[in-house]
Design a protein with these regions (language model features):
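Conserved class I S-adenosyl-L-methionine
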Residues: 17-26
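Short SAM/SAH-binding signature in class I
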Residues: 84-92
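Conserved SAM-binding loop of SAM-dependent methyltransferases across substrates and taxa
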Residues: 27-40
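An accessory alpha-helical subdomain
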Residues: 158-169, 174, 187-273
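S-adenosyl-L-methionine
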Residues: 1-18, 32, 50-83
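C-terminal substrate-binding/active-site "lid" region of AdoMet-derived donor-dependent transferases
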Residues: 104-157
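Conserved SAM-binding motif I beta-strand of class I
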Residues: 42-47
Length: 273
């Protein structure tokens, strides 16, 4: 099976040999691809809607993988028991929905060896949540497809039972986000690739890195540079259109744009020779 560039990038983040749970599977393209390619022995394809799940089941049967890919009607991780999968893939959904799923099933999330996440919106909020909860970032990727930019990440959840603990509820991050990174034996080879974290070193993410991805900035990802330059041009154009205008609303909008430009330019400094 051939995947789109976005789905190919998502699939490439999954560790070979892992049992897969694809949450919001839609057409089941990722589970089919991973099993067909020998990257995974088995997979569970899950979706909250019967229509997409039925279509996914048809694709699985057409691929001849029905004995190795199980279909489940499930709201997020609801029907996945702890220990049933090594990797959860959650791709192609908005950031707020992704966060709701991660927060709703902390025991299941904490039982996973890794998660591969590809939020369609509010990526910075997803990164901030993961860092605050103690997830370890192993890899980040950014793909441009049909004029849109798709960030994705491979993370390891904390395995100390701290996910969803009451003392973390309502935390409001004001200081730089700190991530204590520990070695993960199963990803030792992964950690030497571009876009990977450094599991042996304590890490700190500032606001710019949370917005755009610390690992992407560290590797000077070319697609991220293109994205930042585009975002800079858009905001400069808007500011130019506000020239000569006044009023409280206009002043507030200008201030907002200038703050965004400051972060964009901090990101672009990583590409300076």
């Amino acid at each position: 099976m051939e995947l789109s560039g976005r789905l190919q990038a998502v699939a490439s983040l999954v560790t070979a040999g892992h049992r897969i749970a694809d949450i919001g599977t839609d057409h089941a393209y990722i589970p089919i691809f991973l099993v067909q390619e020998g990257r995974s022995d088995s997979a569970i394809a899950m979706d909250v809607n019967e229509g997409p799940l039925k279509k996914a089941e048809e694709h699985v049967k057409e691929s001849g993988m029905e004995g190795r890919i199980e279909m489940r009607l499930s709201d997020g991780l609801e029907k996945l028991e702890p220990g049933e999968a090594d990797t959860a893939v959650i791709a192609g959904m908005g950031g707020p929905l992704m966060l709701r799923i991660l927060k709703a099933y902390p025991k299941t999330v904490g039982s996973l060896r890794e998660l591969v996440l590809q939020p369609q919106s509010e990526t910075a909020k997803v990164r901030a949540f993961l860092l605050e909860e103690g997830f370890l970032f192993l890899r980040e990727e950014l793909v441009k497809e049909d004029g849109k930019y798709y960030p994705m990440m491979k993370v390891v959840p904390p395995h100390d039972g701290s996910l969803g603990s009451p003392e973390k509820d309502g935390e409001n991050r004001k200081e730089p986000v700190r991530q204590e990174i520990r070695p993960e034996n199963q990803d030792a080879e992964d950690s030497r690739e571009p876009g990977c974290g450094k599991p042996e070193t304590p890490d700190v993410w500032d606001e710019t890195e949370v917005r755009y991805g610390k690992l992407l900035l560290e590797m000077r990802h070319p697609v991220l540079r293109e994205y930042l330059l585009r975002e800079e041009a858009i905001r400069l154009q808007i500011l130019d259109g506000l020239l000569g205008q006044s009023g409280e609303r206009i002043t507030g909008r200008k201030r907002e744009l200038e703050e965004e430009l400051e972060y964009i330019r901090k990101g672009l400094k990583h590409y300076a020779v």
